[in-house]
Amino acid sequence: MIALGIEGTAHTLGIGIVTENKVLANVFDTLKTEKGGIHPKEAAEHHAKLLKPLLRKALEEAGVSMEDIDVIAFSQGPGLGPALRVVATAARALAIKYNKPIVGVNHCIAHVEITKMFGVKDPVGLYVSGGNTQVLALEGGRYRVFGETLDIGIGNALDVFARELGLGFPGGPKIEKLALKGEKYIELPYAVKGMDLSFSGLLTEAIRKYKSGKYRVEDLAYSFQETAFAALVEVTERALAHTEKEEVVLVGGVAANNRLREMLRIMAEDRGVKFFVPPYDLCRDNGAMIAYTGLRMYKAGIKFKLEETIVKQKFRTDEVEVVW
């Protein structure tokens, strides 16, 4: 079976075409903004403009036509309302035109589900991106969020800090590069509250220290990463201890960070659990993960009526009963 997936929860429009065990195409285009940050209306306009050419490109790359597609999946949420609506409308139009079944997919669940294409069975997932920071795992037939940010996502925190340092957007890779030259750890607020995280205090203090002019930016970048990532690893380790699962996966755009990968790998080795990071194009927001999750849902008998395809800006992972 072949599934087409459309992702458009934020500033990236992605279209993926997959079978049960192979990615046939995975193309995307990301809205570039001067100062970073995303305006929902601009994201929607970007997606609307690029949907047709990107769909054409995906079909060409996969070597298939719309007639060959068995099911159409789309990112139903969580995300920016205007952007989600563009994607849902396109998915509905294609489903009606080509008489195909349609499935709405939870974006956060898809990030973890795509790892199963690579043999991962039942992991704890650390999902880190601009807008999201969650530790989630399957328990009792639903993806439960064991810990999450109480304020801003880790990717957002890195971007804002980079912007304050005059590094531009996206800031994550630039902070990572700068951190490699750090020589000294500077004390910054470490906020783990129960199983949840907070990055706003860390961000505020790091900016304050930078503006004081008393610290090397390399040391601040290094200390920012070490503090934030240690908190992420701590909460992930607690979730592993609680669930007694034997696999941990790292997904989302910030999964590109080599220091975060290294810290998680060390923790996984210490606990004797398997650690996996998908190829980067399947870590970031992408259509292939939506297609793959949608295909698994469809094969398990999940079918959506058109009126059930309404977008959900605040779509929680535990709203979805996982029967696939």
Curated annotation (Swiss-Prot):
GO terms for cellular component: cytoplasm; EKC/KEOPS complex. Pfam families: TsaD (PF00814). Fe cation binds at H107, H111, Y127, D285. Substrate binds at Y127, V128, S129, G130, G131, D159, G172, E176, N257. Binds 1 Fe(2+) ion per subunit. Keywords: Acyltransferase, Cytoplasm, Iron, Metal-binding, Transferase, tRNA processing. Gene3D superfamilies: 3.30.420.40. Its EC number is 2.3.1.234. It catalyses: L-threonylcarbamoyladenylate + adenosine(37) in tRNA = N(6)-L-threonylcarbamoyladenosine(37) in tRNA + AMP + H(+). GO terms for molecular function: iron ion binding; N(6)-L-threonylcarbamoyladenine synthase activity. It is an enzyme of class 2 (transferase). GO terms for biological process: tRNA threonylcarbamoyladenosine modification. Its cofactor is Fe(2+). It is found in: Cytoplasm. Required for the formation of a threonylcarbamoyl group on adenosine at position 37 (t(6)A37) in tRNAs that read codons beginning with adenine. Is a component of the KEOPS complex that is probably involved in the transfer of the threonylcarbamoyl moiety of threonylcarbamoyl-AMP (TC-AMP) to the N6 group of A37. Kae1 likely plays a direct catalytic role in this reaction, but requires other protein(s) of the complex to fulfill this activity. HAMAP family: Kae1. PANTHER family: TRNA N6-ADENOSINE THREONYLCARBAMOYLTRANSFERASE (PTHR11735:SF14). Belongs to the KAE1 / TsaD family. Monomer. Component of the KEOPS complex that consists of Kae1, Bud32, Cgi121 and Pcc1; the whole complex dimerizes. This is tRNA N6-adenosine threonylcarbamoyltransferase. The gene is kae1.
